[in-house]
Amino acid sequence: MLVDMHALAPSVDDLLAGAEDRRPFLNPDGRSTAAFEHVRIDGVAHVVKYLHVDDDFAMRVSGDVASRTVRAWRAGLLDAAPDLVDHAIVGASTGWGRNGWGAVLLMRDVSAELLPLGSETIPERQHAAFLDHLAGFCAATWGWRDDPVSGPGLLPYAARWAWFGHYAIEGERALGWPERVPRLAEEGWRRFGEVAPADVARLVEQLRWDVTPLAEAMRRTPSCFLHGDVKASNTGFTPDGRTVLIDWAYVGEGPACHELAWHLAIDRSRLPRSKEATVDAFRAGLERHGVDTGGWWDRQLSLCLLGAVVQFGWEKALGDGDELAWWCQAARESSAWL
């Protein structure tokens, strides 16, 4: 169940009232140029994150003004399964930065609870807990829809498969590549066209121009509320065993298997088990938390694997051949569901 709405601080000054020992820092895993601060409030360590379209590629290409993260937090969506997932956000304020389009998040400092950065394999026990808690979080919001009138107005359904589409890349090129990842993606997509099987390259190219057929096919399967960026560098564990999830930048309605496919694509070098075993564990988690996966699972999983290629085929093309081949085969098999 969802909780009551959280209140916004009237201003950044109010949000950070009483803050001491304010120290700017760089996020070591940051793909954006967003600013961060370490602060102490009542002797407790916190982190402040400043969000604005000027400093974040994903916010720019999806038109995220005043922060979807803040809107989801205010609506109580991040608190859907507090016994399983800790989001660490304790306060927020909007109206920050140019045109008042930005927002500021105040979070508990959970850095000591996060998984270490790098390519070290996630411990099996923690990975099992992560998959179960992620499935439980999806189950807690099963059937949720983002109302087009009453909101909260989060990431539009189809937008999460357009991060690295042609229009997004062209927009970043026109701005002079303010961030490195979109420029790297352009190089990766050129490579994808050279090394991917012709039928897969053609399918992905079409969807990079217009993701509508993929999104419409996904919409015919169940939806829930998505974190949208579940990966090892956004994950940790509290002392009482709950999963910490930070960086709720891509929140919105979508298929649960998106979370799984994203994890498989980004964390492939850190998985303690095969992709297939990870898929089975996530499905079992959904069932354990009360979701009947019969009738829709194969379709949604297959489409989300194709969606991951539309999102990250460029990255796979810059990596090893076996990994690329696995994803290209998954994409080929998915085309039957479109």
Cite the ranges covered by each PLM segment:
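Active-site activation/catalytic loop segments of kinase-like enzymes and analogous catalytic loops
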Residues: R71, A75, E253-G290, L305-S334
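Regulatory N- and C-terminal appendages and interdomain linkers associated
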Residues: M1-G30, E120, W142-P152, V200-E205, ...
